[in-house]
């Protein structure tokens, strides 16, 4: 993966909480979260499960997509995980426009 290629991801905790983040290296970041060296909100909440990931373009675009996902309700995030959309940007746009969504 190129250094400037960002990934948006969702992790699920043992209690069912969904955490949204972005990274350039999903394997490294997941290991950091699992070892308690990632986000404070995930410490002690394991085991963690990677439930969604999608390429998100550059850092700016990834940050915008991350913000949009974080604004979704838990139900909408769970639907995102179930649908596993091919393009996260299109998926989020369809939610804003009230349209149905294509999945993988």
Swiss-Prot record:
What Pfam families does this protein's entry cite? Answer: GIY-YIG
InterPro entries documented for this protein: GIY-YIG_endonuc, GIY-YIG_endonuc_sf, UPF0213_domain, UPF0213_GIY-YIG_endonuc
Domain GIY-YIG span(s) in chain numbering: 4-79
Q: Which PROSITE patterns match?
A: GIY_YIG
Similarity section: Belongs to the UPF0213 family.
> What is the name listed in the Swiss-Prot or TrEMBL entry for this protein?
UPF0213 protein plu4503
Organism encoding this protein: Photorhabdus laumondii subsp. laumondii (strain DSM 15139 / CIP 105565 / TT01)
Species classification? Bacteria, Pseudomonadati, Pseudomonadota, Gammaproteobacteria, Enterobacterales
């Amino acid at each position: 993966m190129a250094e400037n290629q960002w990934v948006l991801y969702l992790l699920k905790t043992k209690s069912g909480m969904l955490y949204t983040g972005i990274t350039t290296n999903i394997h490294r970041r997941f290991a950091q979260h699992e070892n308690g060296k990632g986000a404070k909100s995930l410490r002690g909440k394991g085991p963690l499960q990677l439930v969604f990931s999608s390429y998100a373009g550059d850092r700016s675009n990834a940050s915008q997509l991350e913000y949009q996902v974080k604004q979704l309700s838990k139900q909408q995030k769970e639907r995102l995980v179930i649908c596993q959309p091919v393009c996260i940007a299109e998926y989020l746009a369809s939610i804003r426009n009230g349209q149905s969504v294509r999945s993988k």
